[in-house]
Swiss-Prot record:
This is Phosphoglycerate kinase. Its EC number is 2.7.2.3. It is found in: Cytoplasm. InterPro entries: Phosphoglycerate_kinase, Phosphoglycerate_kinase_N, Phosphoglycerate_kinase_sf. It comes from Mannheimia succiniciproducens (strain KCTC 0769BP / MBEL55E). The keyword Cytoplasm applies. Substrate binds at D21, L22, N23, R36, H59, L60, G61, R62, R112, R145. It comes from the Bacteria. GO terms for biological process: gluconeogenesis; glycolytic process. Pfam families: PGK (PF00162). Signal peptide: none annotated. Monomer. HAMAP family: Phosphoglyc_kinase.
Amino acid sequence: MSVIKMTDLDLAGKRLFIRADLNVPVKDGKVTSDARIRATIPTLKLALEKGAKVMVTSHLGRPTEGEFKPEDSLQPVVDYLKDAGFNVRLAQNYLDGVEVNEGEIVVLENVRINKGEKKNDPELGKKYAALCDVFVMDAFGTAHRAQASTYGVAEYAPVACAGPLLAAELDALGKALKEPQRPMLAIVGGSKVSTKLTVLDSLSKIADQLIVGGGIANTFIAAEGHNVGKSLYEEDLIPEAKRLAAATNIPVPVDVRVGTEFSENAPATEKSVTEVQADESIFDIGDKSAEELAKIIKSAKTILWNGPVGVFEFPNFRKGTEVISNAIAEATANGAFSIAGGGDTLAAIDLFGIKDKISYISTGGGAFLEFVEGKVLPAVEILEKRANG
């Protein structure tokens, strides 16, 4: 990956425009999950240590361009950074210039409020670029989108580089996908085969073993001819599931946990996969299946994990994902390289307290999947172009 890295630049006195991913959940004006902010803090500290004048921005939620609403503001992120000890303030009208003092961080208000952001309007890209001496792309989570704050600004800024977080993401994903230690295992969960089909296809060519979970696994169970009751599955994709199962080693659950309603306190019944009734839905894998998968996980040398194997948010349907999480942590402790990505996966990692037991946790959802699919990420492509003149 030939991009300029922020870590290699002399930044003393330079105006830095950092595009971070601070798109965090907010409730009643407070940040409710701080993983993305925590991941960005080392970049901010490094920029300050190097003597830069630091501006940082991000999108938050899905605001209407050109319309400011208080709930779309990055103010809760500013409050969080203040509490973390930073000298920080919010700038709302910054497109015609903003004063930045040494030692402070200026958070530029939600980029998605700016007209032309999503369409990558060149005029907006030029305005962002005019604010800085160096543009730092550090938002892997939006690297798959060519927008004014991820692509346009990189075209026009005097220098465009990759921040530490983006560089680490690309290195870790490269390690897992380009030269994996064997055997390589990929775990893909989620509700639909259709949304992960290209990912499953790509991984079936790289991985020695695939594990599918969640609604995806239900389609594979149905492909084996079993009744899945009211479970979420995709009948039209059964032929695809059969094709993938024939091409790659994909174990299908032998036992499952079912419920008759989708609710937090729904009672769970464990049974053989052959015994699912018409009024039941599969919400988790059973103990035997979890044990089998844990064995497979513990023998892997590279593990790529995207998605849970059950509705782990509900206590009665949590066990399968918990067993798998702990098996990944154990394999990692024994020398495997593990990389995890995707919102649900990160929530599971938090819930089961294994954050420090995974080799690398990706902050990207869609970008993580597109990289796995082998797609070019526009925001990375422009950094490569700029690095190579």
